[in-house]
Design a protein with these regions (language model features):
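Catalytic core of the metallo-beta-lactamase
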Residues: 32, 81-84, 183-245, 261, ...
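Active-site metal-binding motif and surrounding structural segment of the metallo-beta-lactamase
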Residues: 34, 105-156, 172, 242-248
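Sec-dependent signal peptide recognition
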Residues: 2-7
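A short acidic, amphipathic alpha-helical/loop segment
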Residues: 140-145, 164, 168-169, 233-237
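Metallo-beta-lactamase
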Residues: 16-110, 114-120, 158-226, 245-252, 304-326, 330-332, ...
Length: 333
């Protein structure tokens, strides 16, 4: 019974990628992906995902938010990244909860605490949300950020999500469609297409946009891919923007490939995406944080990334991995 309930919870946030006439679609056609219940059956049959004895152990680092490091990037965990540039602090896909789920007692569970937690952050000026899946849009996290001392950050969200924020009492929200942009305190904020999908309930699949974000400042150009399968969208983004000082690409939640390929890149595809967008450096995200999302070990993505870097002739610094909470200073342009 417990397995059946957990599968239903997962179905609310996974399922198939489809689009009716009134629903958003990806830019580049792909087969409609079905087979969620087949995947769940295979997990049950094969005892996946397999976990190490004693559970996962990840080393965390103490974040450094000193002004001397600006611009800088801190990986808090999963797709939550703090970028500091020009006196601004910008947070991506804030997820600080114990579970990535519509309920608190089931669903993918955190194996390492957010580093730092919400109370350890500097004042957040802006938040960008890639899409509405529970591991990227967390109700408790965004409501606490909106109530931070000194006032709410400005939330930049995909088309169709502003109404959800309004229902939570969050008013400082800018909603954008693909290729639209706004300027905020000297920072250009662009919403760009990536290949993924959206779903938050059993009936709202693909009723809101999904995408990545480009942040452009005189001191830093940054591309946040959010959650994405590999597609020609990355080449399109390079054609528009030329390249980036830093990109953040997902490298985890990719097995089994027959089911996950459309929606989640693997490390080899992430390396190709790094090349496609012409990033000087890339940061690995979307791995090592929540257990139970897909079949591969949480330890596997950075190991495979190291192999793919070597094959592509990239250095560790060109596509780097941070510990949870670790801050990296970025060279000025």
């Amino acid at each position: 019974l417990k397995r059946a309930f957990l599968a239903l919870v997962a179905g609310a946030v996974a399922g198939c990628v489809s689009a009716g006439a009134d629903r958003f679609r990806n830019n580049y056609p792909h087969p409609e992906k079905t087979g969620f219940w087949k995947w769940k059956w295979e997990q049950w049959r094969d005892g996946l995902p397999r976990r190490p004895e004693g559970g996962y152990r990840f080393e965390t680092a103490k974040s450094d938010f000193s002004a001397a490091l600006n611009p800088s990037v801190t990986w808090i965990g999963h797709a939550t990244v703090l970028v500091r540039v020009g006196g601004l602090s910008i947070l991506t896909d804030p997820q600080f909860s114990e579970r990535a789920s519509p309920v608190r007692f089931a669903g993918p569970r955190r194996v390492v605490p957010p580093a730092p937690g919400l109370d350890g952050l500097p004042h957040i000026d802006a938040v960008v949300i890639s899409h509405n899946h529970y591991d990227h849009l967390d109700l408790d996290s965004v409501t606490k950020l909106a109530a931070q001392p000194g006032g709410s950050p400005r939330f930049f969200v995909p088309l169709g999500l502003k109404d959800w924020f309004s229902r939570q009492g969050i008013a400082d929200v800018v909603e954008l469609d693909w290729w639209q942009s706004r300027t905020f305190k000297g920072l250009e904020v662009h919403f760009v297409p990536v290949q993924h999908w959206s779903k938050r309930t059993l009936t709202d699949e693909n009723l809101t946009r999904w995408g990545g974000w480009v942040l452009r400042h005189p001191e830093l150009s940054f591309f946040f891919a959010g959650d994405a399968g590999y597609s020609k969208d990355f080449a399109d983004i390079r054609a528009r923007f030329g390249g980036f000082d830093l990109a953040a690409f997902p490298i985890g939640a990719y097995e089994p490939r027959w089911f996950m390929k459309i929606m989640h890149m693997n490390p080899a595809e992430a390396v190709q995406a790094h090349k496609d967008v012409n990033a000087r450096q890339s940061l690995a995200i979307h791995w090592g944080t929540f257990d139970g999302m897909t079949d591969e070990s949480l330890y596997e993505p950075p190991q495979r990334l190291a192999e793919e870097r070597r094959k592509a002739g990239l250095s560790d610094e060109q596509f780097f991995v941070l510990k949870h909470g670790e801050t990296r200073s970025l060279a000025h342009r």
